[in-house]
Amino acid sequence: MEVFMFPTGTTVIISVLSVLLAVIPWYLLNKLWLKPKRFEKLLKAQGFQGEPYNLSVLKDKSKQNYMLKLQQEDKSKSIGLSKEAAPSIFTPVHQTVRKYGNNSFLWEGTTPRVIITDPDQIKDVFNKIDDFPKPKLRSIAKYLSVGILDHEGKKWAKHRKIANPAFHLEKLKVMLPAFSHSCNEMISKWKELLSSDGTCEIDVWPSLQNFTCDVISRTAFGSSYAEGTKLFQLLKKQGFLLMTGRHTNNPLWGLLATTTKTKMKEIDREIHDSLEGIIEKREKALKNGETTNDDLLGILLQSNHAEKQGQGNSKNIGMTTQDVIDECKLFYLAGQETTSSLLVWTMVLLGRYPEWQARAREEVLQVFGNQNPNNEGLSQLKIVTMILYEVLRLFPPLIYFNRALRKDLKLGNLLLPEGTQISLPILLIHQDHDLWGDDAKEFKPERFAEGIAKATKGQVSYFPFGWGPRICLGQNFALLEAKIAVSLLLQNFSFELSPNYVHVPTTVLTLQPKNGASIILHKL
């Protein structure tokens, strides 16, 4: 009689191992060699050029190594203001474009990053938000997840709708006194540093960071201002740890117990608990029928409450507490970083080009005299606006936008395979001679005398705040804050670049002066 024998545990294990030993080599071969080479062949067939793929790119940490090198380099090594900023900021992209031209690509591990510089193709990328989503956050970058910036599809649309009222111009007008108050406090501190002849030399960068932190703390949290300031310091620490973390893009990060990861977890928990406490107090007051504050958080919670009421309080409608926490992070990271970057480069360039500083001051005094700026007058500042636009062209807060393809797609006449990443190098496009003329790298605010559309000839070649449906919600906030700050500074001081100023633009979360910004102030 034949007896059926069930496989023993050992037999099962051997069978599983045999399958794995057969599958894993093929998986690795495809992932590490065959698939990247197919990408390369397809891209080169369409006229793209780049370094040939080889296994050495898996060890290539050029971006991380560059960041570390930049942190350690001698501060006396200066980059002249007349030179483009790109080589010192994002060397891999710049060097790729310089070597292979605009139609080029580079490798990030096994993933090709295609560099797109054609305005029509850029327009398509920005407009077709479902086809060209942002890359998914990996590893510790999740600790700086900033709300609506990271969302896609229906969740993005819902959050955009709820957050939008907080940034309407009518709401922002109410916040203008807070902008002026914070800036006047900074100016008062600077005046205390003046010598008997009414001058002093100061690194304005830390002061401008504190000013924009002060503004966002007041306008985002109102009466919770002190808590807001503490949150800013915590988020600043998170940003520093993220940018200096060696394993940020390592998919195995979650399995690694590292000091940086542990610190980021601790800070994230502290941020979460602080924001949760602020939000719960506000929501309780809202439910009790108390008047909401006219700060960003109050308007956001009111809008969220209205959305839930309109949909029958469904749990799937509106923002959760965690969603609101993420949006509060965005208030800080986007609101503070963007404006401080814009202001410091504005002072640097106006310090270098005194004729434009004089023209801007004349305009400010003509519109406001020695009074605090008001909303009606801000709309009349044509020269100041031209200057700010030109500063954003030469020194945009972000130096590139990335997008990821989750399916094969056509972009103009290009066929891009699933898995490809797209890079829109803002800095290079803003200084492209073909798009902006032979004076593309020069500071010439007059190019914006008739507005952005005229300066760009209707092309998508200028996008410091993004473009299309996902354009930055806070751009009006940032520009109003910058106009008020520039106006108040010009009313109180003339200023020039110090001989001690060393021009080394670098990117942390935004484009910043690595060695600070030494400015000589003269009291007016």
UniProtKB/Swiss-Prot annotation:
Heme binds at C472. Gene3D superfamilies: Cytochrome P450. It is a single-pass membrane protein. Keywords: Heme, Iron, Membrane, Metal-binding, Monooxygenase, Oxidoreductase, Transmembrane, Transmembrane helix. Induction: Up-regulated in roots by salt treatment. It comes from the Eukaryota. One of its GO terms (biological process) is 11-oxo-beta-amyrin catabolic process. Its EC number is 1.14.14.115. The chain crosses the membrane at residues 9-29. Pfam families: p450 (PF00067). It is found in: Membrane. One of its GO terms (cellular component) is membrane. Expressed in flowers. Detected in roots upon salt treatment. It catalyses: 11-oxo-beta-amyrin + 3 reduced [NADPH--hemoprotein reductase] + 3 O2 = glycyrrhetinate + 3 oxidized [NADPH--hemoprotein reductase] + 4 H2O + 4 H(+). The keyword Nuclease does not apply. GO terms for molecular function: 11-oxo-beta-amyrin 30-oxidase activity; heme binding; iron ion binding; oxidoreductase activity, acting on paired donors, with incorporation or reduction of molecular oxygen, NAD(P)H as one donor, and incorporation of one atom of oxygen. Its cofactor is heme. Its main location: membrane. Involved in the biosynthesis of triterpenoid saponins. Belongs to the cytochrome P450 family. This is 11-oxo-beta-amyrin 30-oxidase. It comes from Medicago truncatula (Barrel medic).
